[in-house]
Amino acid sequence: MSDLAIPTISCTESDGKYGRFVVEPLEKGFGTTMGNSLRRILLSYLDGVAITRVRIDGIQHEFCALPKAKEDTLDFLLNLKNIRVESLSGLEGILYLRASGSKVVTAADIEPSNDFEVVNPELYLLTLDSDDAVLNVELEVELGRGYRPPESAENTPIGTIPVDAIFTPIRKVNFTTEPMHVGRETSLERLVLEVWTDGTVEPATAVSRSADILVKQFASLVSHSKVVAEIEASEPVKYTIPEEKYNMPIEQLDLSVRAVNCLRHAGITTVGEVINRGTKELLTLRNFGLKSLTELEDRLKTIGLSLNPEDELFEEAENNKKKNKGIDED
């Protein structure tokens, strides 16, 4: 319907970790629909950064006692999980925490990195209670979304402690709807959306990314009808990928670490998902350039696949048409 109200969004309050947004005017019922959708995306599907593995000098597992510290290893790990990190490079990596002597250790004691920024340096981690105490810790940082339980200890080397990771940068989302009127139209409403983040992302940016995810999901439904119409109007071109190749993890393509990290950061984990994105969308991914694209195309060719199979098949079909036309004319 072309006469539906077209809303606008405004930020009425923001302090870096909290944002209040008003979307208006909306047709009656659209406030709940939009608010529910945004809330689910915000809480579950935004990319974030978290610590996934910890290595502490002299500690083999989480049940060991921490020498010359007030906290035990479990309490220390619980505190480490609350460290919020922003990835400046879009890549995964390692942070180092080193401290010595009698002191209170906070997240500010983590060594500075060109790739990461700790956004809550005031976070308390533990207390060393001896002048000759020494603490050396390696923190593995990964990109992901939502929540991920710790890896099985059987899959990690001795001395590496896996921890459950909370990747989502969103802490809380609330929304309410209020009735409103525009002129004589009284059946409209407004959506009031409140977003709390952990400081690694601005609330306005989080809302924008969530809306972008929704748009891309619904766009496939819109384009589906166009594709069907085009296929019905022309000679059908079919392309199928064997299931074992479609579900093949991207790691099996032997890509560079940089290319794999870029793809996983975008939520792409299988060969089928790579092909579904296509060349144009892949080039919009952060840190994924022409060099990575060329590398990916070469690896796909080795297993008999292509990034743009539909284009190749369409070109082949057109060439066949021309050949058949030439035969008929002869």
Swiss-Prot record:
InterPro entries: DNA-dir_RNA_pol_insert, DNA-dir_RNA_pol_RpoA/D/Rpb3, DNA-dir_RpoA, RBP11-like, RNAP_asu_C, RNApol_insert_sf. It is an enzyme of class 2 (transferase). It comes from the Bacteria. Signal peptide: none annotated. SMART domains: RPOLD. DNA-dependent RNA polymerase catalyzes the transcription of DNA into RNA using the four ribonucleoside triphosphates as substrates. Residues 1-225 are annotated as: Alpha N-terminal domain (alpha-NTD). The keyword Transferase applies. GO terms for biological process: DNA-templated transcription. It catalyses: RNA(n) + a ribonucleoside 5'-triphosphate = RNA(n+1) + diphosphate. This is DNA-directed RNA polymerase subunit alpha. CDD domains: RNAP_alpha_NTD. The N-terminal domain is essential for RNAP assembly and basal transcription, whereas the C-terminal domain is involved in interaction with transcriptional regulators and with upstream promoter elements. Residues 237-330 are annotated as: Alpha C-terminal domain (alpha-CTD). The keyword Cell inner membrane does not apply. It comes from Dehalococcoides mccartyi (strain CBDB1). Homodimer. The RNAP catalytic core consists of 2 alpha, 1 beta, 1 beta' and 1 omega subunit. When a sigma factor is associated with the core the holoenzyme is formed, which can initiate transcription. Its EC number is 2.7.7.6. Keywords: DNA-directed RNA polymerase, Nucleotidyltransferase, Transcription, Transferase. One of its GO terms (molecular function) is DNA-directed RNA polymerase activity. GO terms for cellular component: cytoplasm; DNA-directed RNA polymerase complex. NCBIfam families: PRK05182.1-2, PRK05182.2-5, rpoA. Belongs to the RNA polymerase alpha chain family.
